[in-house]
Amino acid sequence: MTNIRKMHPLMKIMNSSFIDLPAPSNISSWWNFGSLLGACLAIQIITGLFLAMHYTADTATAFSSVTHICRDVNQGWIIRYIHANGASMFFMCLFIHVGRGMYYGSFTLSETWNIGIILLFTVMATAFMGYVLPWGQMSFWGATVITNLLSAIPYIGTSLVEWIWGGFSVDKATLTRFFAFHFILPFIITALVMVHLLFLHETGSNNPLGTTSDSDKIPFHPYYTIKDLLGLLFLLLLLMMLVLFSPDLLGDPDNYTPANPLITPPHIKPEWYFLFAYAILRSIPNKLGGVLALIMSILILAILPLLQTTKQRSMVFRPFSQIMFWTLTADLFTLTWIGGQPVEYPFVIIGQIASILYFSLILIIMPTVSLIENNMLKW
């Protein structure tokens, strides 16, 4: 009798995706982050669902409903902090996942890569709207500043901003619609993840060498299920250390003050995972130029396959490309730091230099270095 997991219509899909899936035998721990992102998404949906049971999307009661969750709901404080810090874990895994794709040349799997970029934008939109919901000072002013950026669009900008606000300022209508979108988007993300995996399983995974691995495949279970489980334990350890020892480490103290349209906080800044893009936005004096640079800072990932000039897919045997990759990583850390600093000397000029370097590295320097390495292969 044939095994039920290979015959049952539903279990057959699960089997071909997670059990009998042929996987390269040499994929390293950098390949763990896909499954960790899946775990983060599950954690966020579950904790978010419980938070939504007690939260009220109304300007008069939103802030107090979050306080009520933390003080009066059984284990409400831990659910709230797992959700808030879970978002940080989500983005940490996302950035490493994208970085892994760049380093090992996974962007050559263009369908998977492009769906991944759409996923990145969707997750960023979800996180932004989620940050508005507690209706603290930084929630309100963050929503005001970021939505206002759309007014830079010629001709239709102002109308578009008022349409998103549902009025002439960020108010009850804005909060209600942001809650609705924040609730529905994770399910759209889940659907996109399935498409992401569908395209990945069409081609099979890349591996650290960047070579074809058809001649040397192993079943996903038990090898990579156990490996992913170990990665998950490390993720949960890090998350719970953050939640139980310093839950407000990555948050902003201003968000413990209820939203007040009459008082502007001294430094309006988003959560840490948006700071690099925020620094690029601020480094350009022109509003429309800043918005375009902000969008391009992520959208630039889509043209990576076109910028590939190397004969080797992975950076493993390309030391100069490795140096450029880690320079880019350091540049992103610099941009993240600058995004959290006030707009004054010397932070402005550092931000501008780091922004120019960011685009230069991806568009000019890295493809040029790859060409030089190609010529070095002939020597």
UniProtKB/Swiss-Prot annotation:
Its cofactor is heme b. Pfam families: Cytochrom_B_C, Cytochrome_B. Changing T310A: In strain: Isolate 4. GO terms for molecular function: metal ion binding; ubiquinol-cytochrome-c reductase activity. Heme b b562 binds at H83, H182. Keywords: Electron transport, Heme, Iron, Membrane, Metal-binding, Mitochondrion, Mitochondrion inner membrane, Respiratory chain, Transmembrane, Transmembrane helix, Transport, Ubiquinone. Component of the ubiquinol-cytochrome c reductase complex (complex III or cytochrome b-c1 complex) that is part of the mitochondrial respiratory chain. The b-c1 complex mediates electron transfer from ubiquinol to cytochrome c. Contributes to the generation of a proton gradient across the mitochondrial membrane that is then used for ATP synthesis. This is Cytochrome b.
